[in-house]
Amino acid sequence: GDRKAQDEMLHAAYESGVAILTTRTTAAHAMSYQITKKLGAAHGHACMLTLPHLWAHLAAQAEYQPMLTELSRILGGEKPMDGAILLKGLLAVLELDKIPMPDDATLDMLAASVNPERLGNHPEALTTAQLRAIYVQAFTPMTDTERAEAIAAWEQYGK
């Protein structure tokens, strides 16, 4: 019942809407809608499932490595993939990294459901096949070694 807090939340929601209208949304955000609707993951959780894999997709290309290195440095890392590893660590520590792999029909539906207009803020266009591959990666459990590395990165964050 705090009227001031309600007004501030309403203003923040409005400003967020204006920002998305201007810049479009991120690929992780665009890919999250049907994960939430069909698989029941919270919206933010759904975004975090794909974000490290979108990061890795870009990091595999030389032209994006300087940008990802800078983002990783902001997060306390040094190499282009450090930010993605940190994000995976957060998912692992919170035990949010274990959503079962959807069946092929669901994976196809997820990939086909992404609105290309909502990918307008992503550094490159993504095909339906690339989106599907990123969904598969997002639902594939980390190996024990990957998980340990990601958790160690997260635990080191901020120290």
Question: Residue ranges of each PLM-predicted region?
Answer:
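Intrinsically disordered or highly flexible coil/loop and linker segments, enriched in small
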Residues: 19-25, 80, 96, 100, ...
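Gly/Pro-rich interdomain helix-loop hinge
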Residues: 38-39, 44-106
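Short, amphipathic C-terminal "tail helix"
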Residues: 105-159
